[in-house]
Amino acid sequence: MSFWNTRRILVTGGAGFLGSVIVEKLKEKGCKTISVPRSKDYDLVDNDACKRIYQETKPDIVIHLAAKVGGIGANRNNPGKFFYDNAMMGIQMMEQGRVFGIEKFVALGTICAYPKFTPVPFKEANLWDGYPEETNAPYGLAKKMLLVQAQAYKQQYDFNAIYLLPVNLYGPRDNFDLETSHVIPAIIRKCLESQNSTIETEREINSAQVAISESQSCITIWGTGNPTREFLYVEDAADGIILATEKYNKTDPVNLGSGFEISIKDLVKLIVKLTNFKGKVVWDTSKPDGQPRRRLDTTKAEKEFGFKAKTRLEAGLMQTIEWYMKNKATVVC
């Protein structure tokens, strides 16, 4: 009998980007009872809603994915909201899980929880060696508190909670809203939408400055392009989380990543090639770069529960681009 056959699973954020993939994979594994709460029915910032969700769904295992997330701009403009909502959702859901007596709580952290100048590759032991990059610090610290809570609850209550640290995810169903999206969906959308855009430029004609309209594609990317990032394809991330849920029962945090680091400049070049974008890329150096480098040491995940990412970046990007082109009418905001 499968680990999943008889267990009742609650997946917060289960209708979202990562959550929907996890739910599909759980069904494939034979899980018969999966609850996916919707935000319109359960505001997880409200403790009474957290209590009600346990009473109504009666889960054995909770995979807590619900989060307030966004790119640099969204984090910079809403630091209080990102801190409060993420802290309250996670802390209350874990506490009510303890009170309800669930078998296991799976908490997702974030690479943003690591110190700004962590030695590369990031090892789990480095997590407390400094303050996070300032732009993402409120979000990163809020998620980091779930690790503290998991370890404290194990010590005092013998409560089984694990804490996973994924890198930035990408793939089909990602958030392509330019106000809140992460770097990969934002660049893909900009490249595809700018192919035939018309912009106003100034050109000197007969010694006079006049504004004319010309067909010219141009995309603007924040920062210098020098920082490096690591990305994990959403299908791989879902596999890692499911494996950890089955096999990992320690309170030590575990990284989930691909082990592949790429500069933002090289990432843009790759997406430009894959989207066949022929226009100009402008780097807005007045905007923040964020953390200088990000790459995880993923040896613990492989050792503890056999996880290793399978999808190469270019292949994953191509699948993401193809999905967006087929679905942009329904996902573009």
Which ranges hold each PLM region?
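Conserved Rossmann-fold NAD(P)-dependent oxidoreductase catalytic core, especially the SDR/UDP-sugar
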Residues: 91-136, 162
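NAD(P)H-binding glycine-rich loop region in Rossmannoid oxidoreductase-like domains
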Residues: 48-86, 96
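C-terminal substrate-binding subdomain of Rossmann-fold SDR/epimerase-dehydratase oxidoreductases
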Residues: 17, 23-29, 193-333
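Short-chain dehydrogenase/reductase
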Residues: 83, 87, 135-147, 177-182, ...
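NAD(P)H cofactor-binding loop motif with strongest signal on the N-terminal glycine-rich segment
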Residues: 14
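Adenosine-cofactor binding site in Rossmann-like domains, unifying the SAM/SAH pocket
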Residues: 27, 32-52
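Active-site Tyr-X1-5-Lys
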Residues: 134-167, 186-197
